[in-house]
From Swiss-Prot:
Belongs to the TrpB family. This is Tryptophan synthase beta chain. The modification N6-(pyridoxal phosphate)lysine is found at K90. HAMAP family: Trp_synth_beta. The beta subunit is responsible for the synthesis of L-tryptophan from indole and L-serine. It catalyses: (1S,2R)-1-C-(indol-3-yl)glycerol 3-phosphate + L-serine = D-glyceraldehyde 3-phosphate + L-tryptophan + H2O.
């Protein structure tokens, strides 16, 4: 039986609750409320009804037959989280935490966002539940994800651009936590990934674990067996944790794909496992990208959802224990994988998801045709069209 987290929120050496005294009480309140609802049949019934009727679960498992044929190796299956309401896996967690907030009597939501997908999901569930919603987003991400910013505002959320640091996800998270410290009596902080202080990594994992559970059952029905390998992209790591959870006790190879940006031998990457060291970020002990003085080095990725300088503490444990292998994928490799899936399957994935696809495509080529790779397609790529147009401008112009 997989024993983590333990009673103090640790995953082996990692995790915990490294926060100012002012946050201990609100975190304890969330932990108590979460324990009460986690296995409560009435809560689970309400939650899964929302997932089915509002978000459209279960999501499909799609055999990528033309990509499989093109690569000539293992059969590639895609868990289609892009088909969720709002376009990614983020709605799974947002619905769960909104219900938790409701049970706690909170009616004001705070959220941070990078690619904007969690912000959109938070704004969506806030509208559904009649909550107010304030979303913190780095100004760099506001610029490159303008479509999602407009969506959040349409949904009634206030979007607060964060100008400190690099203007990306880390900075948005810092500001969201600062705001929560001052308003924790009536606000609920809806964190978007398996990061932060205990109990957040456990809460988010719980509200994402249906990804792997569904995929496992679907693949068994279709192929009659387990996958040989499971691949997911990793920033903070919530889609990966949701996918991996169902396979941790199975004889299945699990692989996380981090963002190598311009290359892990350059300063422009977000490869936390490959290049990071142990430290504390946003209340949790984990791996992070830092200098010799413990100062966080600003991460970089073409993907707004992966340029986070830390990683969820459970991923840190799974890396150290050897249970999960983590590799890094460059911007160029991710864009190439995105183009291949779009052209061969008619599916435009998010740039985040394209990191997982790139790793899966590399692996598939070296595997037998009878083997299976399961990939978490965490989101759709509509939000990335402006970025892609800039990156592929000359190529696109040639086709117009």
């Amino acid at each position: 039986m997989y024993p983590y987290p333990n009673e103090i929120g640790r995953y082996g050496d990692f995790g915990g609750k490294f926060v100012p005294e002012t946050l201990m009480q609100p975190l304890d309140e969330i932990q108590t409320a979460f324990k009460q609802i986690k296995d409560d049949p009435a809560f689970r019934e309400e939650y899964y009804k929302l997932l089915k009727d509002y978000s459209g679960r279960p999501t499909a498992l799609t055999y990528a037959d033309r990509v499989t044929e093109y690569l000539g190796g293992a059969k590639i299956y895609l868990k289609r989280e892009d088909l969720n309401h709002t376009g990614s896996h983020k709605i799974n967690n947002a619905l769960g935490q909104a219900l938790l907030a409701k049970k706690m009597g909170k009616t004001k939501i705070i959220a941070e966002t990078g690619a904007g997908q969690h912000g959109v999901a938070a704004a969506t569930v806030a509208a559904k539940f009649g909550f107010s919603c304030t979303v913190f987003m780095g100004e760099e991400d506001v610029a490159r994800q303008s479509l999602n910013v407009f969506r959040m505002k349409l949904l009634g959320a206030e979007v607060v651009p964060v100008t400190s640091g690099n203007g990306t996800l880390k900075d948005a998270t810092n500001e969201a936590i600062r705001y929560w410290v001052q308003h924790c009596e009536d606000h609920f902080y809806m964190i978007g990934s398996v990061v932060g202080p205990h109990p957040y990594p456990q809460v988010v994992r719980e509200f994402q674990k249906m990804i792997g559970e569904e995929a496992k059952d679907q693949l068994k029905r279709i192929e009659g067996t387990m996958p040989d390998k499971v691949v997911a992209c990793v920033g903070g790591g919530s889609n990966a944790m949701g996918m991996f959870q169902a396979f941790l006790n199975e004889d299945v190879e699990l692989i996380g794909a981090e963002a190598a940006g311009k290359g892990i031998d350059t300063p422009l990457h977000a490869a936390t496992i490959s290049k990071g060291t142990v430290g504390v970020i946003h209340g949790s002990l984990t791996y992070l990208i830092q200098d010799e003085f413990g100062q966080i080095i600003e991460p970089y990725s073409i993907s707004a959802g992966l340029d986070y300088p830390g990683i969820g503490p459970e991923h840190a444990y799974l890396h150290k224990s050897g249970r999960v292998t983590y590799d890094s994928i460059t911007d160029e490799e991710a864009v190439d994988a995105l183009k291949l899936l779009s052209e061969k399957e008619g599916i435009l994935p998010a740039i985040e998801s394209a990191h997982a696809l790139a790793k899966a495509f590399k692996l598939a080529k070296g595997m037998d045709r009878g083997q299976l790779i399961l990939v978490c397609l965490s989101g759709r790529g509509d939000k990335d069209v402006n970025t892609l147009m800039n990156v592929l401008e000359e190529e696109v112009k040639a086709h117009v």
